[in-house]
């Protein structure tokens, strides 16, 4: 469960904002995949939209079970898992899982091409890189061992996505911190956990702090897909979730 870490100094509140599906938004933008970009920017639910495409059904016919399968495919692509792992995760046969992945790659052809470009570029240079130029060297790509090479290819595909998302949250942290100081507020950024930021705010500042955190997170990087941050205010971290 979540920590009930409380904040009771001078009746302070915790303001918590987290990115909505940042890695998939980064993927759509970096891959310049118009189908996925349009789905995000139209406000559609990306997992339902993916399910409709992969299973060949209209969105209104997508059941929670189909949506959750599509969600596993979406994140499976980001984390570079293959048909075998996907099959285990969602309880289908390897053959069916492979069909889902193939159908996904057919739907989001920009993503498929991008993944291949990332592998080729990493083989060429010896490293994978984020949108901001941070590198991860991949000697595994030149290994004679097949398992090591496969690992290197997986990292070459997903490090640019996960790494860029990690870069963006760090940029957001700097922006939030600067803005709170610039507006002479007492609120302070106290914690970053994965894709969320937590600010401790005096009660009177909480609403404004929430507005600042979400604004700065959403403007941390200018990409083809708009970033979205959802925030809440609470007495404890648990409440603010």
Name each model-derived stretch.
Residues 31-41:
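Cytochrome P450 catalytic domain signature, combining two hallmark sequence patches
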Residues 20-22, 196, 236-238:
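Conserved nucleotide-binding/hydrolysis micro-motifs of P-loop NTPases
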Residues 176-230:
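C-terminal structured "cap/appendage" subdomains that terminate the fold
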Residues 20-32:
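Short active-site loop/helix that positions an aromatic residue
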Residues 14-18:
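Short hydrophobic beta-strand that contains or immediately precedes a catalytic carboxylate
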Residues 2, 23, 43, 47, ...:
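Hydrophobic (often cysteine-bearing) scaffold residues that line and stabilize catalytic clefts
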Residues 52-185, 191-192, 202, 232-241:
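Conserved catalytic core of nucleic-acid polymerases
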Residues 1-6, 10:
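Single conserved hydrophobic/aromatic residue that forms the stacking wall/gate
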